[in-house]
């Protein structure tokens, strides 16, 4: 059997050209692996056939939607992970899943080389290659777009010269990546930071300033940090994301326009749509505020930031990430209950919380009759709490 290369295949121009190019340049057979992450668009059977038509000896489509939701999106919810306080890691958390299946396919087909279509300016090259190195350190990696400085024009010329069945007549001005967790848009006129996004940038969300529908009130139920029901109806994690993408997206929830610090050292403007992700993370945070003790909550917020950075930086399979996963999972033991939210005008606003695991004690919190808080203890507490500051202040005043 000839040497084989396993390619992470998207169905787009670059990876379609890569199939033929790898065969011609290396003499290897190409096995194309396409992952269904709920990205929509083309039928995956069409994508599979295109890979074969471009010269792949085998073309595999893997339905990983539930796996993505349960093993990648759910940990992101439980970690309340928002890179730079905003971005719910739409693309970042999909890459380790693709890497996992790429490595498994390489082992199954006896390949010692894998390939991807990432450029040299983005984060994904790091996510792919660091992830591959963590799971299969002996695998070789080919990155033709990066290593041979492919441009769109070069790729089109190669496709035409080799009569590859790729339709390249219509060119979007944007680079788009999407899955069930959200949608990322960049490049084109968006590279000028002063240019406002036009309506054609968006697809997952309605314009909240124009499409002012009636508010949508809903209740999300969590069990140990897992969303298990919407409005009392049981749902899987995937079903929760899909339903909230529709309901929150219709209200314009989840639009982000940010300048992002890329791992490779440059700043990049990104437009994100993540209605389901933002709604679920907002609800989960609200329930944690009710059910997690103060010091644990404070420390978890530090962990959340680092967790998001590790996921963004391609270190999903790192020892530190695994350790933080264990910490986050332990914090979820009491994160059970209901969160009521109103979706409207681009916002997901929490307006109700209830939980049998709640640490909120009405009788301690109330200022009305029935107050059980012993205020006689407060004076001594205040004095002890501020004692070190008072001692330091006396020293400083005496030295003036």
Swiss-Prot record:
SUPFAM superfamilies attached to this UniProt entry: Adenine nucleotide alpha hydrolases-like, Argininosuccinate synthetase, C-terminal domain
- Gene Ontology biological process: argininosuccinate metabolic process; L-arginine biosynthetic process; urea cycle
- Where, by residue number, does L-citrulline bind? 87, 123, 127, 175, 260, 272
Domain of life of the organism in this record?
A: Bacteria
Cellular component, GO annotation: cytoplasm
Listed binding positions for ATP are 8-16, 117
A Pfam family hit: Arginosuc_syn_C
Q: Does the keyword Ligase apply?
A: yes
- Residues the record lists as binding L-aspartate: 119, 123-124
Q: Which reaction does it catalyse?
A: L-citrulline + L-aspartate + ATP = 2-(N(omega)-L-arginino)succinate + AMP + diphosphate + H(+)
Query: Which principal EC class is assigned to this enzyme?
Result: ligase
From the Swiss-Prot or TrEMBL record, what is one GO molecular function term?
A: ATP binding
Q: Kindly report the protein's main subcellular placement as a broad class.
A: cytoplasm
Which EC numbers characterise this protein's activity in its record?
A: 6.3.4.5
Q: Where does the UniProt annotation locate this protein?
A: Cytoplasm
The record's keywords, sorted A to Z, are: Amino-acid biosynthesis, Arginine biosynthesis, ATP-binding, Cytoplasm, Ligase, Nucleotide-binding
Note the PANTHER family from the entry.
ARGININOSUCCINATE SYNTHASE
Its assembly, as annotated, is:
Homotetramer.
NCBIfam families xref list: argG, PRK00509.1
Recorded protein name is Argininosuccinate synthase
Q: Which species is this UniProt entry from?
A: Nocardia farcinica (strain IFM 10152)
Recall the taxonomic lineage recorded for the source organism. Bacteria, Bacillati, Actinomycetota, Actinomycetes, Mycobacteriales
Q: Which gene encodes it?
A: argG
């Amino acid at each position: 059997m000839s040497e084989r290369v396993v390619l992470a295949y998207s169905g787009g121009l670059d990876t379609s050209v890569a199939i033929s190019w790898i065969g011609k340049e290396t003499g290897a057979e190409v096995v194309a692996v396409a992952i269904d992450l709920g990205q929509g668009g083309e039928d995956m059977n069409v994508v599979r056939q295109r890979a074969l038509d471009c010269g792949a000896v085998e073309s595999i489509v893997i339905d990983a939607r539930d796996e993505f939701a349960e093993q990648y999106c759910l940990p992101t919810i439980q970690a309340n992970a928002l890179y730079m306080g905003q971005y719910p890691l739409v693309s970042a958390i999909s890459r380790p899943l693709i890497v996992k299946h790429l490595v498994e396919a390489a082992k199954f087909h006896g390949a010692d080389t894998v390939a991807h279509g990432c450029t040299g300016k983005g984060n994904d090259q790091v996510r792919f290659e660091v992830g591959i190195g963590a799971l299969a350190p002996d695998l070789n990696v080919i990155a033709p777009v990066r290593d041979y400085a492919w441009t769109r024009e070069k790729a089109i010329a190669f496709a035409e010269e080799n009569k590859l069945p790729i339709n390249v007549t219509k060119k979007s001005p944007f680079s788009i990546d999407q899955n069930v967790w959200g949608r990322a848009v960049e490049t084109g006129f968006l590279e000028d930071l002063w240019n406002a996004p036009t309506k054609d940038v968006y697809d997952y969300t309605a314009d909240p300033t124009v499409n002012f529908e009636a508010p949508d009130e809903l209740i999300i139920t969590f069990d140990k940090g897992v969303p298990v029901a919407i409005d009392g109806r049981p749902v899987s994690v995937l079903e929760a994301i899909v339903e909230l993408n529709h309901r929150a997206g219709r209200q314009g929830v989840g639009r982000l326009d940010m300048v992002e610090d890329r791992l490779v050292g440059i700043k990049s403007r990104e437009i994100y749509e993540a209605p389901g992700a933002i709604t679920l993370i907002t609800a989960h945070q609200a329930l944690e505020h009710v059910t997690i003790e103060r010091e644990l909550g404070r420390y978890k917020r530090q962990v959340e930031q680092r967790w998001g950075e590790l996921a963004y930086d391609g270190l999903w399979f790192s020892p530190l990430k695994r350790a933080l996963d264990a910490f986050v999972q332990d914090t979820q033991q009491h994160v059970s209950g209901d969160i009521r939210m109103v979706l409207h005008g681009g916002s997901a606003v929490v307006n109700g919380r209830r939980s049998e695991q709640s640490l909120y004690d009405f009788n301690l919190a109330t200022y009305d009759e029935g107050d059980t808080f012993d205020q006689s203890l407060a004076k001594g507490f205040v004095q002890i709490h501020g004692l070190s500051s008072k001692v330091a202040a006396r020293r400083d005043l005496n030295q003036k």
